[in-house]
Amino acid sequence: NDPNNLVEGRYVCIRRANDLSQETGFIPSPQVGTHTDEKYGSHHAKDSAALFHTLGMDLNLFSSAMKVNSQYMHILWFNLQVKEPTSITSIKERLYSNERVAMTTKDLTSSVFSFGRDHGHFGRILNQTVVVEQTLNVKNDHEITGFCFTPQDGNSILSSISAAEWLLYPHSYIDKIQCLSHLFF
């Protein structure tokens, strides 16, 4: 739980080309992005670092991005180096206990998207991320690697509801949003 435990975080954002409802912007093949920031790479790490900076944390992050010709979900490959030794069992326990994280053994974005459509609140997965369990790896007790999917719509819906509740009820917003907890997977 110590934010100082993170030595560095590297990740690749594999973005969907466009949303299912969009009629334009689809690409015919994978397209790589550029590193627009020398320190952070793509804007994703820069945005993440800025967010964590509001909490007083100065994280060593770097990201790359690319788009693929899919309309389902973004995919994130991550590699985290930590100071304290850890294990795959410990990582899985922490992820399973985090209500904002969904765990799956499905390895296709279409399967996870379909699950959300069939079982989610109005077809949406409200969790912030869906980690693919069998992709998790711990190397030398200090390096954590894996893949996760981003349920784009549900992610922003929950964030927006949380932000509105925080604005209205800054001391009790966490209690207020618990009415949605049964919708997390």
Kindly give the residue locations of the regions a language model identified.
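Long, low-complexity C-terminal extensions of enzymes
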Residues: 145, 149-157, 161-164, 168-175
